[in-house]
């Protein structure tokens, strides 16, 4: 009330013509603000569904909402002059400092707090000022369930608004991601593969799962545990039955601090994305004659359980980012076939490219995680029947590498494709025409109006020019040439496509070049628009 009395005094002086018209305006403005300020209150809100949106699996006890899985979050709009959120720590604050939970607080999508939780309570200031404003707030667990969660205890706000706190709107699409360390973003911020795990370098906001959900404008829920598998956790070949996801899928969390069964009825998903099998590899591959069938059967059982809990969901299965695709993926394919559910599909993930860097303990780098988010969003679009924009996707990633030679013109050659999809071509006799020997990456789908970047690295022992063509059955979309040298050279060119093509190919024409060795690597055709 003191502010109002002072303002009224100033206004009285103005009415006696003691102050100028400009000062009279300023005094009125002060009076209005003073009245509003006196109507504002310091309020405290609990993080319950009436006030906030809770994303992902969570646990509630003593009015605290614990976010307990990678990416689990509390989101709300706050309208007021100032606001804080109070974060609680649980038993995990006593973990070794490398294994304490990490969380982030975002205001209008900007990270304002990134903290390893090491105390029982911590207050984060969201904003402070004299002018009322509305912001969107998110409190998210950045580390994984293995290392505990953090609790949102209360939201404190000074506000004059009738609705100071309200939930962020739900998205139209909801995706559940089930996985292991790859899904959790294990080591994604580590400088290299030689650094060991710690939660300070694990960041779910850089995981393919988070980025794919963001690209698809979807809500998400995560169930992922590092080192876990379908029938065995990570091992040197002996069975590790204590680290399997199917045994804990129906629980809120494996962590005993957050007991109870998950409420599937009120948390149905439109899509379930499963990325498991990497940690099973060492166990399964040691005795494939018997263990392949064991894996297939347990995967069938897991799909059956997921379908029971999510009757209408589309389910997409994959494995392979950290290897194991050749050994484990066929088993997943077989399990999907045995279940016979038309809403379940699968694909083999491309193994990470070492040239894109590595995170802790040889885990995917930020580049690899980002690229896989484009792949995952594209696969989800295909599964649910909506058009994918394919932006960010390397449409040549699954292309078939092969060569053609015109033996009638005397052309001869050999080729080899490396595990990293490097392409080695050695000509004997080059033939008579430039088209007599062609190295091809085929089976590429192109979209009309799409803008793509064609990239690759090349080298040869001879200096010459090699034609490079992007063509379909009846149309050449692009034509250029590269000058070869003994030094590895990077090529990059932007291409706009004028019409759809479901079976295009990248072609390198090596005809007429006798005894010519040509090496290609990192061939990519990435859609950028």
Could you say what each language-model-derived stretch is?
Residues 1-4:
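Positively charged n-region of N-terminal signal peptides that target proteins for export
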Residues 7-15:
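Bacterial N-terminal signal peptides
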Residues 9, 21-178, 183-201, 389-390:
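N-terminal secretory targeting modules
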Residues 69-71, 188, 194-288, 323-329, ...:
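Conserved SGNH/GDSL esterase-like catalytic core that processes O-acyl groups on lipids
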Residues 86-101, 145-146, 324, 447, ...:
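Extended, low-complexity, turn-rich repeat/linker tracts enriched in Gly/Pro/Ser/Thr and Asp/Glu
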Residues 108, 246-385:
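Alpha-helical cap/lid subdomain in secreted, periplasmic
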Residues 390-529:
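Extracellular and organelle-lumenal recognition/adhesion modules and their flexible linkers in secreted
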